[in-house]
A protein has these predicted regions:
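Conserved phosphate-handling catalytic cores of large alpha/beta enzymes
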Residues: 413, 432-446, 450, 459-460
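Intrinsically disordered, low-complexity segments enriched in small/flexible residues
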Residues: 1-87, 91-94, 100-102, 184-266, ...
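Amphipathic alpha-helical substructures
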Residues: 251-272, 277, 491-521
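Short acidic-hydrophobic, aromatic-tinged amphipathic segments that line or gate anion-handling sites
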Residues: 171-172, 275-281, 415-416, 517-523
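Cleft-lining beta-strand/loop regions that shape enzyme active-site pockets
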Residues: 58-60, 65-190, 313-437, 476
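Alpha-helical coiled-coil heptad-repeat segments
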Residues: 463, 468-469, 473-490
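Short beta-alpha connecting loops at secondary-structure transitions
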Residues: 418-426, 455-472
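Generic long, charged, amphipathic alpha-helical segments
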Residues: 376-382, 389, 484-489, 496-503
Length: 630
């Protein structure tokens, strides 16, 4: 609820409102426990006994610690929904690595005198190129603090090696090998296979490089497709070579030769200079004698121990809003925001940032390959309205292509990772034709309509030239609109945009050369730019503000478990859980709602009762209250 609206309410109305939210929250809690109670019992039984996890860490300036970061699993840049995180932790299957958590912990560790060094172990690490680039940048920044950084490669793929090479010492598992071909695109084509099944695809497009449906029509990539993939591959390879060469202290020609050869045994990798040692942990490298006496602390335990922030947060000047748009763009209701990007779902966040006086600038994090043209245009309009009133900086993740780029262009500044896939300024449509399918399998299609486009609408028919002309005109109109809006946002003539467009995809580095983005960098760089545009001191920390969600009607809290979770997150939990926490804490009261919940949950954990809850609830409830180093 908008803070100004709260102030305008009379006292009785405010009391009634708080009682309503309280009751609604309890409905959500009760409904959630009833629905998930049996699941919780089974899950806890299957997890087995044992001690609750400990987050206490014992080290000091006199006896500094070695931090260990295990990089096994999926890198995720957006924190998962409350229900997803709860269920994954409940069943012990939460292998996701959250980049914001890693960034915060490494930043603090770099300035913490109690931390002597960092060891990372890289196994089955997966993620987009942009996420891996962001992770590597964090490690480079930690190394630049002057503290030793050791990396142990359990599995040696090219992008795992890319991350590991940020370390000053790289150790390779003796049973492993390095397989590093570098950027590789595998293009699979189904044209002939579909024709054998009696299926033909008619593609209508604006932009000769717009090749999304080419695989369903042809048996091999077109020259235009090969051209854009070759240039993008070379751009990504050049970045990979430059980054590894700088960290390993080698010339670019040597590193490029490594990737061309592609395959090394552990001993060959050591002899060629790709790694420094062969072994199972950091002790295989030249550690000082004092390292053996240093306590070994997991990075997640260090983060949970409440490591001190080195700089104060400026709380009285407002803050910067972070809005995340991740996934495909499609039409849908606001409740489908967890399943991609919808105009209604994102509009709530954009309008909140536009009207909330505490928000002085906005970082819009976009990671989207595109989607619906209509949905993209609706979001573009909302971003435009926001940018007309407050500075907006777009931070591009893995993708900001097609519709993902469309919704980016109203922002005052666009920042991409070198490995971001962007551009794809074009429009494409597909019409399946099943006439041969009808002849082959005896399946017929009949359509009853007064429309003159009957053959076009019938999957078993063939559209006329007039049909195709009409469809092409709609495609061309959308493309023309796309060009005009890019030209408006990037402040360049439409003809120049058209020359860069044509549906062609680019790496972030290519996009910078073409002036489709303003700078190369990650999310921290976007926050720095936002601070500049907001008139903040870039060397100080300011609160990062998050949209807390709209309130739910009472009956909405009684829906599916997922809906109950959303109800808890969007207001119900903030009111209902504190009194519940106080009650469960055997009457212990607290003036701080977050503190009350934390103390109660700590007792549960110490009793070994519910070890999955601290990370689940504290991350979600504390999130709107917390400030980070942006």
């Amino acid at each position: 609820v908008n803070e100004n609206a709260q102030q305008r309410r009379s006292l009785p109305l405010r009391i009634i409102h708080r009682l309503y939210v309280l009751v609604r929250g309890y409905f959500a809690v009760v409904g959630l426990l009833v629905t998930l109670g049996p699941v919780l019992i089974v899950a806890l039984a299957t997890r087995g006994g044992g001690e609750a996890p400990k987050t206490k860490v014992d080290f000091s300036v006199e006896q500094p610690a070695r931090l260990k970061l295990g990089l096994h699993g999926l890198l995720v840049e957006k924190e998962p929904g409350i229900s997803d995180r709860f269920l994954s932790q409940l069943f012990g299957d939460d292998r996701s690595l959250y980049l914001p958590d890693i960034r915060s912990a490494l930043r603090r560790a770099a300035a913490d005198e109690r931390v002597a060094r960092l060891e990372i172990e890289i196994g089955s690490l997966t993620g987009s190129l942009a996420e891996l680039t962001e992770l590597r940048r964090m490690l480079v920044e930690f190394r630049e603090s002057g503290k030793p950084l050791h990396a142990v490669l359990v599995e040696g793929s090219d992008w795992n090696y890319y991350v590991a090479s940020a370390a000053g010492h790289v150790i390779l598992n003796p049973a492993s090998s390095l397989i590093i071909p570098g950027p590789t695109f595998t293009l699979t084509y189904f044209g002939e296979a579909l024709r054998k099944l009696g299926v033909e695809i008619e593609v209508l497009r604006a932009g000769k490089y717009k090749s999304a449906f080419e695989a369903f029509v042809q048996n091999a990539p077109s020259e235009a497709t090969l051209e854009q993939y070759r240039t993008m591959e070379e751009s990504l390879r050049a970045h990979l070579v430059e980054a590894v060469a700088a960290s390993r202290g080698k010339d670019a020609a040597t590193v490029r030769g490594w990737f061309k050869r592609s395959i090394f045994t552990a001993e060959q990798a050591r002899a060629s200079g790709l790694v420094d040692a062969i072994g199972y942990d950091a002790e295989a490298s030249d550690l000082p004698a004092t390292a053996a006496r240093e306590p070994l602390v997991k990075l997640e335990d260090y983060a949970a121990s409440g490591a001190p922030e080195t700089r104060p947060v400026v709380e009285d000047q407002g803050g910067i809003a972070l809005i995340e748009a991740v996934g495909e763009i499609h039409m849908g209701d606001a409740g489908m925001a967890d399943e991609g990007i919808t105009p209604l779902g994102l509009r709530r966040e954009l309008r909140w940032a536009q009207t909330d006086d505490k928000v002085k600038a906005v970082v819009l994090r976009i990671s989207s390959p595109g989607g619906s043209a209509v949905a993209s245009d609706m979001i573009w309009n909302d971003v435009r309205k926001l940018a007309a009133e407050k500075p907006v900086v777009v931070s591009m993740g893995a993708y900001a292509a097609s519709g993902g780029y469309y919704i980016s262009v109203p922002a005052q500044r666009l920042i991409a990772e070198p490995t971001t896939i962007t551009g794809s300024i074009g429009v494409i449509g597909m019409l399946p034709r099943l006439g041969a399918f009808e002849e082959k399998y005896g399946v017929s299609f009949h359509i009853v309509t007064q429309s003159e486009r009957a053959n076009l609408l019938n999957p078993g028919g063939k559209g006329s030239d007039e049909d195709r002309a009409l469809m092409t005109s709609t495609i061309d109109q959308v493309y023309s609109t796309f060009l005009e809006k890019v030209a408006l946002g990037r402040k360049m003539p439409v003809s120049e945009v058209d020359a860069r467009a044509q549906g062609r995809v680019y790496s972030g580095l290519q996009a910078l050369d073409l002036k489709l983005v303003d700078a190369i960098g990650g999310l921290p760089d976007a926050f720095k730019a936002a601070k500049e545009l907001a008139g903040f001191d870039v060397d100080k920390l300011y609160p990062v503000l998050h949209y807390e969600g709209d309130e739910f009607a009472l009956h909405e809290c009684l829906g599916s478990p997922q809906q109950m979770m959303r109800c808890l997150r969007r207001g119900g939990a903030r009111v209902a859980l504190p009194p519940l926490a106080v009650g469960l804490a055997w009457g212990q009261a607290s003036t701080s709602r977050a503190e009350a919940i934390a103390k109660t949950l700590e007792r549960w954990v110490d009793a070994g009762a519910l070890a999955v809850w601290p990370g689940y609830l504290s991350a979600e409830i504390d999130r709107p209250m917390s400030s980070t180093s942006r």
